[in-house]
Curated annotation (Swiss-Prot):
Protein's UniProt name: Autophagy-related protein 27
InterPro entries in alphabetical order: Autophagy-rel_prot_27, Man6P_isomerase_rcpt-bd_dom_sf, MRH_dom
Species for this entry: Scheffersomyces stipitis (strain ATCC 58785 / CBS 6054 / NBRC 10063 / NRRL Y-11545)
Chain ranges on the Cytoplasmic side, renumbered to this chain: 215-269
Locations listed in the record: Cytoplasmic vesicle membrane; Golgi apparatus membrane; Mitochondrion membrane; Preautophagosomal structure membrane
Any Pfam family: ATG27
Gene name of this polypeptide: ATG27
UniProt family annotation: Belongs to the ATG27 family.
Signal peptide: 1-17
Membrane topology: Single-pass type I membrane protein; Single-pass membrane protein
Length: 269
């Protein structure tokens, strides 16, 4: 019973994740960003350094095992203390998580100051210790004269209560269905891959090899040849005779068809 309840809760959490097929995102192309993104802030705090890394799951939740993030997080922040000269050993001091089942709001915006539009996704209802925390992710459609790095998160602020992060991406531009993510075009074949003719040739060679060797072995086992080499020579001779007869056979077939067509023309007259 408990196992079934746990499975249901996991499925519900995944269903509520940052879903690229959500109705509010149907005019955008967030499939371009599908995956786990991160942004890191490093602060010098002698005699140590404080590393704050935020992870963002776009169109899929963050799985357990990524750093110290809890399972099924949409957004996860990990703060760790690193002693100078000992970067391998670190102490995790803070873990902040916005779970997939939190309430999310999607709000399109238009910013005249940067001459651009986009959509903001907000998380509410999360807790971190005794604190209630929220998150606002702002996805901006890059303007014409864009100087920002695309598809990279920027940590705008984190004060222990609200996370603000932003990203400039074409995924945040209103897109028609026909312009949405399409599979990348196939690279032209520059002779690096084998064509169908090559495969036919290979199979033909294999078939002939099996036919010749198998036929020789059959002749030898039946006692029709003194030794295997004689049997092989006999099969090869028969095969050569067969090849010589192919042109005459083809000519006979062609003549038969052409003569039939001529008879049809005469009868029509």
């Amino acid at each position: 019973m408990w196992a079934i309840a746990g499975l249901i809760s996991v499925l519900l959490a995944q269903a509520a994740a940052f879903d690229c097929s959500a109705k509010e995102l149907e005019h955008y192309n967030f499939e371009l960003l599908k995956g786990i993104h991160s942004v890191t802030s490093l602060k010098d705090t002698p005699p140590s350094q404080t590393n704050l890394t935020w992870y963002f799951g776009i169109c899929e939740p963050i799985k357990e095992g990524l750093d110290a993030c809890p399972q099924n997080s949409d957004v996860c922040g990990i703060t760790s203390i690193i002693l100078k000269g000992d970067s391998k050993n670190r102490v995790i001091s803070e873990i902040v998580s916005f779970n997939t089942n939190l309430q999310k709001t999607y709000e399109p915006f238009s910013d005249s100051e940067i001459d651009s539009t986009g959509i903001a996704i907000s998380y509410t209802g999360a807790t971190w210790g005794d604190n209630s925390i929220n998150a606002a992710l702002r996805f901006v459609c890059p303007p014409k004269n864009n100087e920002h790095i695309l598809d990279k998160f920027k940590l705008d602020s984190w004060d222990g209560k609200k996370l603000k992060a932003s990203m400039y991406s074409k995924a945040a531009c209103i897109t028609s269905d026909k312009d949405k993510l399409k599979p990348p075009p196939k690279k032209p074949d520059n002779g690096e891959s084998w064509g169908w003719f090559t495969w036919i040739f290979i199979f033909l060679v294999l078939f002939l090899s099996i036919y010749i060797v198998g036929g020789a072995w059959f002749q030898y086992n039946k006692g029709n040849a003194i030794d295997f080499s004689s049997a092989l020579r006999e099969v090869l001779d028969n095969f050569v005779e067969l090849l010589k007869g192919i042109p005459a056979f083809s000519r006979e077939i062609i003549e038969k068809f052409t003569s039939n067509s001529n008879r049809g023309e005469y009868s029509a007259v």
